[in-house]
Regions:
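AAA+/SF3 P-loop NTPase mechanochemical coupling elements
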Residues: 62-67, 101-119
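Conserved AAA+/SF3 P-loop NTPase catalytic/coupling segment centered on the Walker-B
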Residues: 69-92, 126-131
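A short helix-turn-beta junction within AAA+ P-loop NTPase domains corresponding to the substrate/partner-engaging
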Residues: 126-145
């Protein structure tokens, strides 16, 4: 919430720091109020600046919404394909936008306003492990109380006061590392990872040096393919993730 408020207040215009972290509310059970809770974060006067419509297949439209909305809900985040993650990562990091409006010949520089939040009905939802620090996965154990009214004025007044008093609105390196460790519970396991575990293990000091193999990535792949051809069918050693 501090990051969201700082983004709205444009408190970091000079250091190119954007709110690049999105909480993800995760539960395999439906009806716990995930999407409702996301909507409730916005006060009534800002409801029109909330959206659950975010199409990553249209990069220009997705970028424009960073300047048009205050909170973007990546609803059903687990349905986003791995091929969309690089674009989403870039959009989440964007601090300044160059957008060409309709009927205009040149682009205009617009401030980034939007922050992200998301929901998922699956726990194996993260496919980009190098970028997992950008997502703060929260596993829900019970329904969210969406009936008690949110005191938006008090909430945002407190956030504003803390920010103007110098409160940090981003995670440092140590905190990012903790987030990545926590997110290991939410990684999507791909078939070749399972095959690798079946075929190999890392050597230890107790192993006989004569039995320890030094293999290249290609050699590892060929052995995995030979051991489990049906699982590895259609895969190559250089497949782009």
């Amino acid at each position: 919430m501090l990051g969201l408020s700082a983004q709205w207040m444009q408190l970091n215009p000079d250091n190119n720091r954007a709110n690049s972290v999105a909480p993800l509310l995760v539960s395999s059970r439906q009806g716990l109020g995930k999407s409702t809770f996301c909507r409730l974060l916005m006060p009534d006067t800002l409801k029109s600046y909330y959206t659950e419509s975010y199409d990553l297949s249209s990069p220009a439209s997705a970028e424009a919404k960073l300047a048009a909305y205050g909170l973007i809900n990546l609803d059903e985040f687990d349905k986003l394909g791995a091929s969309k993650m690089p674009l989403l990562k870039n959009l989440m990091q964007a601090s300044a936008l160059n957008i060409r409006k309709a009927y205009k010949h040149s682009a205009s520089s617009l401030p980034r306003i939007a922050s992200f939040i998301g929901t998922s009905n699956r726990e194996d939802l993260l496919v980009d492990r190098t970028g997992s620090r950008r997502f703060l996965c929260v596993s829900l154990k019970h329904a969210i109380d969406c009936t008690t009214s949110v005191e938006h004025k008090q909430l945002y007044a407190q956030l504003k006061t803390e920010l103007l008093s110098g409160e940090r609105s981003w995670f440092n390196k140590e905190e990012e590392q903790t987030i990545q460790q926590h997110n290991a519970l939410f990684y999507k396991h791909v078939p070749e990872e399972e095959v690798f575990r079946l075929c190999f293990r890392f050597a230890t000091e107790e192993d006989n040096p004569q039995e320890v193999l030094s293999l290249s990535a290609t050699q590892l792949f060929e052995r995995m393919k030979a051991a489990h051809p049906s699982i590895m069918r259609g895969m190559t050693a250089y497949r782009d993730r």
